[in-house]
Amino acid sequence: MDVFKPEKLFGIIGHPLGHTMSPLLHNWGFAEHKIPAVYMAWPTEPEKVESFMQTFRNLPISGASVTIPHKLSVMDYIDQLTERAESVGAVNTLYWDGDKIVGDNTDAAGVSEPLRPYSDQIKKALLIGAGGAARAAITGLQSLGIKEIFITNRTKSKADDLAAEFKISALDWDARGDQHLDLIVNSTSLGMSGKFEEINPMIMENQDKNTIIFDLVYNPLETVLIRKAKSKGCTVIHGIEMFVHQGLEQFRLWTGIKLDEKKARELLLEKL
């Protein structure tokens, strides 16, 4: 009997990690291309990030995905940032270049690529949330040439800080639903499977069929925001689209191989 013997180890760090489908995507990719590697989930509490990075440096780990809430904190423990990670100001991908740990970011492409077909009709966009995913979302939106971008967050000071850094405008949390918008992007965990699942991050009274809703939450597929947007006739983009595009780019960075986008999407949709 053949025994699978992985030669390379990859994984994802975050907290919590109960909802992650990254192992499914990457392990499928390894199997599809007969790569002797395995990808695991490593739940890592914030106070243990430094310890994890020491482990990454000392054990034969070939690469890692980084998710909430570690996309900023891991930057203290890497040797080199890519240009796009510097632009975003956050890291979601780790890999080795010789003996240096490199931090990269594939999230901005995960936002921009699903929106590209609609970019000409997006003049005014609102981003909900001010964490690591928000930074990537702003970079992705700006790469599409969207000029009028607003950001809102329950903690206003965080929105103010990002607005100043990226030269966009901050809105009060209670004012987020006051105007009609061409695009709304949710980068918070509100609506995610678990304790926040039934919390809608957006007030939808002033939105209509001309509004595009992009919820970066991908589990569940039909979030409370997506359901409300559909009831208003809005165009909706599910979080699975960001997940697919950022994940395919991670796989390419680690292996040099571009996975089949359609097959990857079908694989993930089967699990949602």
Curated annotation (Swiss-Prot):
Residues reported to bind shikimate: T20, M21, S22, T67, N92, D107, Y218
GO biological process, one term: amino acid biosynthetic process
Residues bound to NADP(+): E83, G129, A130, G131, G132, A133, N153, R154, T155, K156, S157, K158, L216, G239
InterPro entries: Aminoacid_DH-like_N_sf, NAD(P)-bd_dom_sf, SDH_C, Shikimate_DH, Shikimate_DH-bd_N, Shikimate_DH_fam, Shikm_DH/Glu-tRNA_Rdtase
GO molecular function: NADP binding; shikimate 3-dehydrogenase (NADP+) activity
Pfam families (alphabetical): SDH_C, Shikimate_DH, Shikimate_dh_N
Active site per database record: K71 (proton acceptor)
Keywords: Amino-acid biosynthesis, Aromatic amino acid biosynthesis, NADP, Oxidoreductase
Catalytic activity as recorded in UniProt: shikimate + NADP(+) = 3-dehydroshikimate + NADPH + H(+)
Summary of subunit composition and partner proteins: Homodimer.
Biological role: Involved in the biosynthesis of the chorismate, which leads to the biosynthesis of aromatic amino acids. Catalyzes the reversible NADPH linked reduction of 3-dehydroshikimate (DHSA) to yield shikimate (SA).
Protein name as catalogued: Shikimate dehydrogenase (NADP(+))
Origin species: Maridesulfovibrio salexigens (strain ATCC 14822 / DSM 2638 / NCIMB 8403 / VKM B-1763)
